Amino acid sequence: MNPYALIDLHCDTLTDCIHKGLTPDTLDDPDRVLSLTAIPSDVHWAQFYAIFIPDQHRGQAAIDYYETNRDNFNRQMEKFHDRISPCRSASDMQAAWEAGKTAAFLTIEGGAALAGDITRVKKLADDGVRCMTLTWNGENELGSGHTTTHGMTDFGRQAVREMEDRGILVDVSHLNDTGYADLFETARRPFVATHSNARAICSHKRNLTDDMIREMVRRNCLIGLNYCKSFITDGGIGDSPDDLYRHIEHFFSLGAYENALGSDFDGAALPTYLNTPAKAADLYEYFLEKGMSKELAEGIMFRNAEEFFRKNL
């Protein structure tokens, strides 16, 4: 039994086309984890396609890299216009679904795309960007990722406020612990962790602490469960959906019911039970078999993200 819909808050499929030097017209490449054909035909699908900005890119190099991938996104939306539709809102997503198309949101992973220029937030919003991860693993002009110890910069705080004003969701996945504390002092609106799990279950620093989770609950934020093996179990050991379910149970125990999915397709090593879009859709039936209510299961698959979009995009 498949769900009515599935909303995936993160994949690296778009920049995988450029990053590996392959042809750009590959949203339907069968050699990738995520392709349009691989999406179950009976599931209304929404996908956040991230432009990943490598840590080494700064200034004009970061802008050029972003624009190359933005242009590729636009080309692919045109190339596959009968199967996928670019979206900027929940209503756009619903319209795409009603037309039998995948809903595609353009996002960014790495605030270096701003090149330290606050006026670029408006430019990104005008381009259709609807979510931006502030950092990747290292440092950029906004702050520091989990491999470093510094917090957010003054520019990063300014960028968060501007993103909120321009309708770009603030994504805190990859931000380090100090940066989280700074973000909590800065953010005025609900934000997202597009692809993060619970650190109490898997101790990787990329995952959220209990205090972070509680604060996100208090602020009506959204958390996307990450499929990366290294963020599900310590050492990436094990290959059972029960491993991911332990994170869900822990989130629930902290009052974090506003969970979603953030696959990291084409950007991470995945367990065999989550290494295709069809298997991700199978989570719905698995949740029901575990005794989860239909309401909670549908919430994780799509309803929580859909409602968050309606309120915040």
What are the residue ranges of the model-derived segments?
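A short, acidic, flexible beta-alpha connecting loop/helix-capping segment that sits on the rim
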Residues: 52-54, 267, 302-307
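Extended, charged catalytic domains and RNA/DNA-binding interfaces, predominantly
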Residues: 2-226, 230-233, 245, 249-252, ...
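Second-shell loop/turn segments in exported
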Residues: 60-61, 235-237, 272-274
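Basic/polar N-terminal segments that are highly enriched at the extreme N-terminus
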Residues: 1-2, 313
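Soluble non-cytosolic domains of exported or imported proteins
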Residues: 30, 238, 242, 274-278
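Short acidic/histidine-rich active-site segments
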Residues: 227, 254-277
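Mid-to-C-terminal alpha-helical segments outside catalytic/metal-binding sites
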Residues: 275-313
